């Protein structure tokens, strides 16, 4: 149970998550890290089985480094997504209980984001939410998303989407992590005034 959000804008991608880690109805951790830096130009969110996703995203991180060493350039994001999809597809009948948003900026597609589900299904998205709080977050995204959003506006929208989930979903809570991936700055963690004030408000 969790909430993760991704938004694509012209200049980059914004990813955001809550920080609550649950085991059934038990709050197992209050400072969970659900954002994973794969390389300077790409990151992923984690929703579902933490151990499964940590294992798979470790594979992706190593693959990205191997590609950069071999070809002297960052790995295309679609290649990473395809690699994850193959891992999930060929793991059957064992199923990894995972859901991930992978997004960033590359030379082939510019700012781009994909969602990968536990069966290996891949969908290209402009905005998306996963996890138990996704119905609440998705509603905020549906109302607030525009094609001409700036990165800063997308950060605010992502925070508001996670905020709605925290207010309504018992599986989400404790705080918000936000990262941006842009061509100019690469991977960057965001700490905004709204983010810092979020917990007292709730």
Curated annotation (Swiss-Prot):
PROSITE patterns: PROTEASOME_BETA_1, PROTEASOME_BETA_2. It comes from Pyrobaculum arsenaticum (strain DSM 13514 / JCM 11321 / PZ6). This is Proteasome subunit beta 1. One of its GO terms (biological process) is proteasomal protein catabolic process. The formation of the proteasomal ATPase PAN-20S proteasome complex, via the docking of the C-termini of PAN into the intersubunit pockets in the alpha-rings, triggers opening of the gate for substrate entry. Interconversion between the open-gate and close-gate conformations leads to a dynamic regulation of the 20S proteasome proteolysis activity. The lineage of its organism: Archaea, Thermoproteota, Thermoprotei, Thermoproteales, Thermoproteaceae. It comes from the Archaea. The 20S proteasome core is composed of 14 alpha and 14 beta subunits that assemble into four stacked heptameric rings, resulting in a barrel-shaped structure. The two inner rings, each composed of seven catalytic beta subunits, are sandwiched by two outer rings, each composed of seven alpha subunits. The catalytic chamber with the active sites is on the inside of the barrel. Has a gated structure, the ends of the cylinder being occluded by the N-termini of the alpha-subunits. Is capped at one or both ends by the proteasome regulatory ATPase, PAN. The active site is at residue 2. It holds the Pfam family Proteasome. It is found in: Cytoplasm. Transmembrane segments: none annotated. GO terms for molecular function: threonine-type endopeptidase activity. Keywords: Autocatalytic cleavage, Cytoplasm, Hydrolase, Protease, Proteasome, Threonine protease, Zymogen. GO terms for cellular component: cytoplasm; proteasome core complex, beta-subunit complex. It catalyses: Cleavage of peptide bonds with very broad specificity. Belongs to the peptidase T1B family. Residues 1 form a propeptide. Its EC number is 3.4.25.1. Component of the proteasome core, a large protease complex with broad specificity involved in protein degradation.
């Amino acid at each position: 149970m969790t909430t993760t959000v991704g938004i694509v804008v012209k200049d980059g991608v914004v990813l955001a998550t809550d920080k609550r880690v649950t085991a059934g109805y038990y709050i197992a951790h209050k400072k969970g890290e659900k954002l994973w830096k794969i390389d300077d130009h790409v990151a992923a969110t984690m929703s579902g089985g933490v151990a499964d996703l940590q294992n798979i995203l470790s594979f992706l991180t190593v693959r990205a480094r191997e590609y950069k060493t071999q070809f002297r350039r960052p790995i295309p994001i679609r290649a990473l997504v395809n690699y994850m999809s193959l891992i999930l597809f060929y793991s059957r009948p064992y199923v990894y209980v995972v859901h991930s948003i992978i997004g960033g900026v590359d030379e082939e597609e510019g700012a781009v984001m994909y969602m990968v589900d536990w069966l290996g299904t891949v969908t290209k998205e402009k905005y998306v939410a996963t996890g138990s709080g996704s119905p609440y977050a998705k509603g905020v995204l549906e109302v607030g998303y525009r094609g001409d959003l700036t990165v800063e506006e997308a950060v605010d929208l992502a925070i508001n989407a996670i905020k709605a989930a925290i207010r309504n979903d018992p599986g989400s809570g404790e705080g918000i992590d936000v990262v941006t991936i842009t061509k100019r700055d690469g991977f960057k963690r965001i700490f905004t005034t709204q983010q810092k004030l979020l917990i007292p408000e709730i």
